[in-house]
Amino acid sequence: MPLFSKRKNNTDSKDKQNTDERNQEQQQEKERPVLISPSLAKNIAETKKEVGSSSDVIIREIKIGEQDHVHLAVIYISGLVDNNTIHESLIDPLVQDESIQNTHAIQQILEKTLPLGGVKAEKSWDKLFSELMLGNALIFADGHDEALICSTQGGEQRSIQEPSTQVSFRGPRQGFTESLQTNISMIRRYIKNPNLWVEKMKKGSVTNTDIALMYIQGICDEKVLKEVKQRLEKIDIDSILESGYIEQLIEDETFTTFPTMYHTERPDVVAGNLLEGRFAIIVDGTPFVLIAPALFVQFFQSVEDYYSRFDIATSIRILRVLVFFISLVAPAVYVAATTFHQEMIPTQLLVVIAAQREIVPFPAVVEALTMEVAFEILREAGVRLPRVVGSAVSIVGALVIGQAAVQAGIVSPAMVIIVALTAIASFATPAFAMAISARLIRFIFIIASAVMGFYGLILGIIMMFVHLCSLRSFGVPYMSPLAPFSSQGVKDALFRVPWWADEKRPESVSKEDKVRQGKDQRPEPAASRGMVNKDLEEGDQNGT
């Protein structure tokens, strides 16, 4: 009892300490003046008080106008601004304009002095500091109770490159960057329509991360939009460093291995999903964009499916789904067959497997778990190592460990083949989030097969499908258009029909503008051949 009281007192003291720190932060915010002062000296002092001794915050005081009567201060953060813009479009025009009068300095600078596109006046300290942290420059003038915010964002950024996680043999070669505005502009180049709306907000009480919600007005479901806006407004956290934060805070189901939001770094993928009625969430500082509502079949679709012929795309999609289930159940089937159901194995194959396992001291389940864990370690090591040696380590390591394990009699050659086939099959899933889900579920199926044989495996598969059917992505059934079945949605699910036959958007996603193309879009080869023959006949007659 005393120990319990001591722990409770420690918890209460920690809660009280956290409450005191929170109250202290709120008190400091209250002490900061809401509006700027007409005194330039006070404004500079308030800025220094807020940013502390940060060496990258530049405060440059200059005197301009006739006889230097106007006293200004230009404040910006080095590294977040474009230095050429600061000097050529900000400092130089201010110094050269001698017509500026002290009584109307801010108004004159705003209206005619600066050639910058984005300049606006502001009085609120909160807004000014927020813009300063974004890379914009501030101009204060002595005797004026408002400052100017100048658009000077710049600094070093990664150039547009080919996506590294979603490589395509056909299609655009550009991927998203870490710049929010650049990513938005890349999507707008695909969808040149005023109904493509972008709503920006800031999340993270400390980081103040910019987030953009993008959708096509009139195509995206209004109920889904209302739901996602409510979930985004509810977010109250100190930092947002990557889109994964947002995904985990707004997804429908937390306790599931299956992803209920799709992420990509390809602008054409985002554009295609927006045109189907989905929305996208873009986070500043990351090239990965979130897309929802997400469906189970969506994770087996690749961008080049839509750039290739429908028959080729259909065959590859079916192959991906089959390979996905092979990666799920292959080790479990081997464990169940060799442990409980030897009568189902052909006699000659059973004799070969029995001869291989004669010197193996462990049961099949231990073999499977050991090799699976070893392959997962090698795969993780290959990802974390430098790219030059990572792939070599994973491949060579797998060969060496597999051969050594067989020679040592720890595992059988058949088990090495099964695990290797499973590892290769997992790479065929286009979406990494779905592939890693299979890697986790595979262990559950192996244990179920070791306990109950094929009965345990079948029970596990049934439970998995029941769980999949219970999932929702922003209210949309995760297994649609298969469950519930949709005749229109199934045209672009496990297989893809020709473009001329896919007249409407997916019913489970888009409730507004469902029609995406006109009727009678099917090409008429017979008529085309007739036209060609007619042209040839007319040409022959003219020649004679």
UniProtKB/Swiss-Prot annotation:
What keywords appear on the UniProt entry? Cell membrane, Germination, Membrane, Transmembrane, Transmembrane helix
Compositional bias annotation for Basic and acidic residues: 9-33, 504-523
Check the record and name the InterPro entries matching this protein: Spore_Ger, UPF0353/GerABKA_families
Chain spans, region Disordered: 1-36, 504-544
Where it sits in the cell: the answer is: Cell membrane
Source taxon at top rank: Bacteria
Q: Which GO terms describe its cellular component?
A: plasma membrane
User: Per the UniProt record, which residue ranges are transmembrane?
Assistant: 279-299, 321-341, 392-412, 416-436, 443-463
| GO terms classed as biological process | spore germination
Q: Which topology term describes how it sits in the membrane?
A: Multi-pass membrane protein
Q: What is its main location?
A: membrane
UniProt-listed PANTHER family: LEUCINE ZIPPER PROTEIN 4, SPORE GERMINATION PROTEIN
> Which family does the record claim for this protein?
Belongs to the GerABKA family.
- Role summary: Involved in the germination response to the combination of glucose, fructose, L-asparagine, and KCl.
By what name is this protein known? Spore germination protein KA
Query: Coding gene?
Result: gerKA
